[in-house]
């Protein structure tokens, strides 16, 4: 059986793309999109740790010349399990933000906006009446004009202008008043979504493509803005204005005009809604292709160095081009269907307007209507063209925004699996803490166990090392203690208490971690150190920098601690990054310390200097330290060594006792590392030798 692995260059090479433009999501690039629009590319630093298997650009894997389709990725399976959110539920959830309980300020703004909306529509309907009066006043024999008529005409014209300006003024005031409500709603939803994503477990994040995730958040936030404005300023006003015009036509000119108007509105709405529903699938396909293109670009750009190392620029360009072509095809269908919708809408409205104008002209000829009435009917019906055009575009964009918001609200509906128990207690951090694994079984995949019925104890206040071959479960122990995952069986105790009964925040606050690849923010050295404890004073940060022996580095840098480390810390060396990580955990001052392959990527000289720094700062009995290591020389002085093999504890003891044990796995690993020799070169054949 072949073991299928999906290669991810980001596991081996740093991501080197600097941020281009900050938005609600970091690393936001805008690239040309087909047909004159723009396609934003979300470049988000991946949430996956470097030792996690990531999904590559292509989901297919070649094994022995055959193309093998891997099982559904975590993202796909997770997607199928994600709860669906109905449009009605989305609108109901959104209503809570524009009419929040107990917030009178927001409610007052909404009521004022609705009042201004009503006033603008009433003034807007008055405009055709003032125009009719002006036309009728002018339709006289000018030789009989007295002095009073010009004044009446002047007042009518002034009223016409005042009504038009008043309607526009009320609309702008309404927008200004409601903008605060809309932006506050967007801010609240964005923040709540971000906070919810931070609460979701690590397994959920590993199963998602970050580029598509940030794109969904970006579109969803924009969708909120549009839905709020559409519902408050378009749907309600259009309905109100159509009802008012139909009532006026019925009262002024009879049921025949109102019947045509009502039939037109009904046919127009049915055609718009059905055509838009048909177009929705094209929009969904476009969004899917858009996410795919963004993910391909994201994976390619953040692994820029790997692309160059293997000369695969053309391969990735072809991948990106394929995604863009799918997006282009979807957008063409969107544009073509939009042209069909606009043509149908205009045909329906123009036919109705022509019929009503013909009827009005007959009325003028028969003497039942005046020329002013003809103008009034034309103005009233034609005035509906604006809200009707809005109805079509608003419904189209409203459906699209609801689709975009669906993805955003789906994120909020994902359940948090790692959470506090009802009676969670705080973990005491004023004393050394021990860690006990009792019959723990765990696997990232149900078909592949990483730990199998493991039991061991990490003594309090002592240095314990965990060693073993690759894949034996060493780093998994940290993830379980940190409660990134829950064990399938057994339990883990810290300080004598099951970690499931401990407050999650207090547990994680008690654990300090120095990882193999230190995650750094694209910020200054000072801010990166401060991240270990953001409430620390300047003096405490300086002491942590001194203890981690970063002072010399800062002295050699032109800007000192204000130097920006670059994306993922590329502006400083590996040893300096690890010292920065040590400064962080010194600032955190946690009673439990994990060093997860903290020196494996360093040269011998840097490794020894870093081990000396660790020894100076973490050798006291006040802290429990756990070292996960491949290089056995770095943990030879440990008080206890736990050797793992194939997910089980093979042996335990000190360095000397394990070396003294004949046939021990630890001794075999030690001998291999200490007696490593170069393989002999094969002898050349006699025929190839030269005298």
Swiss-Prot record:
Keywords: ATP-binding, Membrane, Mitochondrion, Mitochondrion inner membrane, Nucleotide-binding, Transit peptide, Translocase, Transmembrane, Transmembrane helix, Transport. Pfam families: ABC_membrane (PF00664), ABC_tran (PF00005). Glutathione binds at residues 279-283, 342-345, 392. The keyword DNA-binding does not apply. Residues 110-400 form the ABC transmembrane type-1 domain. GO terms for cellular component: mitochondrial inner membrane. It comes from the Eukaryota. Residues 1-22 form a transit peptide. The keyword Heme does not apply. PROSITE patterns: ABC_TM1F, ABC_TRANSPORTER_1, ABC_TRANSPORTER_2. It is found in: Mitochondrion inner membrane. One of its GO terms (molecular function) is ATP hydrolysis activity. It is an enzyme of class 7 (translocase). It is a multi-pass membrane protein. Its EC number is 7.-.-.-. The chain crosses the membrane at residues 110-131, 155-178, 228-251, 253-273, 340-358, 374-395. Belongs to the ABC transporter superfamily. ABCB family. Heavy Metal importer (TC 3.A.1.210) subfamily. Homodimer. PANTHER family: ATP-BINDING CASSETTE SUB-FAMILY B, IRON-SULFUR CLUSTERS TRANSPORTER ABCB7, MITOCHONDRIAL. This is Iron-sulfur clusters transporter ATM1, mitochondrial. It comes from Eremothecium gossypii (strain ATCC 10895 / CBS 109.51 / FGSC 9923 / NRRL Y-1056) (Yeast).
């Amino acid at each position: 059986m072949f073991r299928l692995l999906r290669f991810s260059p980001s596991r081996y090479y740093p991501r080197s793309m600097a941020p281009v433009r900050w938005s609600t999501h970091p690393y936001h690039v805008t690239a040309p999109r087909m047909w004159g629009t723009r396609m934003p590319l979300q470049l988000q630093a991946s949430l996956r740790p470097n030792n996690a298997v990531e999904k590559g650009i292509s989901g297919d894997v070649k094994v022995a010349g055959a193309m093998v389709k891997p099982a559904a990725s975590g993202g796909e399976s997770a997607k199928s399990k994600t709860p669906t959110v109905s449009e009605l539920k989305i609108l109901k959830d959104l209503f809570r933000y524009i009419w929040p309980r107990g917030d009178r300020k927001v409610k007052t703004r909404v009521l004022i906006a609705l009042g201004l909306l009503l006033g603008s529509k009433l003034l807007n309907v008055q405009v055709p009446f003032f125009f009719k009066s002006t036309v009728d006043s002018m339709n006289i024999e000018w030789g009989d004009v007295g002095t009073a008529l010009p004044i009446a005409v002047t007042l009518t014209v002034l009223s016409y202008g005042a009504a038009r300006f008043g309607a526009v003024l009320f609309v702008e005031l309404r927008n200004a008043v409601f903008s605060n409500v809309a932006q506050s709603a967007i801010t609240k939803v964005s923040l709540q979504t971000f906070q919810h994503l931070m609460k979701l477990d690590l397994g959920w994040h590993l199963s998602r493509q970050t580029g598509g995730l940030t794109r969904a958040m970006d579109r969803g936030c924009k969708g909120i803005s549009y839905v709020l404005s559409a519902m408050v300023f378009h749907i309600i006003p259009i309905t109100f204005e159509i009802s008012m015009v139909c009532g006026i036509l019925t009262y002024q000119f009879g049921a025949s005009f109102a019947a045509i108007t009502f039939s037109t509105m009904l046919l127009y709405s049915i055609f718009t809604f059905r055509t838009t529903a048909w177009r929705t699938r094209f929009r969904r396909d476009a969004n899917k292709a858009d996410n795919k293109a963004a993910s391909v670009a994201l994976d390619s750009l953040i692994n820029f160095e790997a692309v160059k190392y293997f000369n695969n620029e053309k391969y990735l360009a072809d991948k990106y081009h394929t995604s863009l072509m799918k997006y282009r095809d979807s957008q063409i269908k969107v544009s073509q269907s939009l042209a069909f919708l606009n043509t149908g809408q205009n045909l329906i409205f123009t036919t109705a307007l022509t019929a009503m104008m013909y009827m009005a002209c007959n009325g003028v000829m028969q003497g039942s209507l005046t020329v002013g009435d003809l103008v009034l009917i034309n103005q009233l019906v034609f005035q509906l063209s604006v809200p009707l055009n809005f109805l079509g575009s608003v419904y189209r964009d409203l459906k699209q925004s609801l689709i975009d918001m669906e993805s955003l609200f789906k994120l909020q509906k994902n359940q948090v699996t790692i959470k506090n128990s009802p009676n969670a207690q705080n973990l005491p951090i004023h004393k050394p803490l021990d860690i006990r694994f009792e019959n723990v079984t765990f696997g990232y995949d149900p078909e592949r166990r990483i730990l199998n019925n493991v039991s061991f104890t990490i003594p309090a206040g002592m240095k314990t090392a965990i060693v073993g071959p690759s894949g034996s479960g060493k780093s998994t122990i940290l993830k379980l203690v940190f409660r990134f995952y829950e064990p399938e069986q057994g339990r883990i105790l810290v300080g004598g208490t099951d970690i499931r009964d401990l407050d999650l925040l207090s547990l994680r606050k008690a654990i300090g971690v120095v990882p193999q690849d230190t995650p750094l923010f694209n910020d200054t050295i000072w801010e990166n150190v401060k991240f270990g404890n953001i409430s620390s004073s300047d003096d405490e940060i300086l002491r942590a920098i001194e203890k981690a022996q970063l002072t010399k580095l800062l002295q050699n840098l032109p800007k000192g601690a204000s130097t920006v480390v670059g994306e993922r810390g590329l502006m400083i060396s590996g040893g300096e990054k690890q010292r920065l990580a040590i400064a962080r955990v010194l600032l955190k001052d946690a009673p439990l310390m994990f060093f997860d392959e903290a020196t494996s990527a360093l040269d011998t000289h840097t490794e020894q200097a870093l081990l000396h720094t660790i020894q100076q700062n973490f050798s006291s009995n006040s802290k429990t330290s756990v070292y996960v290591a491949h290089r056995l020389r770095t943990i030879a002085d440990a008080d206890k060594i736990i050797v793992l093999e194939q997910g089980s504890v093979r042996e335990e003891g000190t360095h000397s006792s394990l070396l003294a044990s004949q046939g021990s796995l630890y001794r075999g690993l030690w001998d291999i590392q200490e007696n490593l020799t170069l393989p002999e070169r094969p002898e050349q054949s006699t025929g190839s030798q030269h005298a």
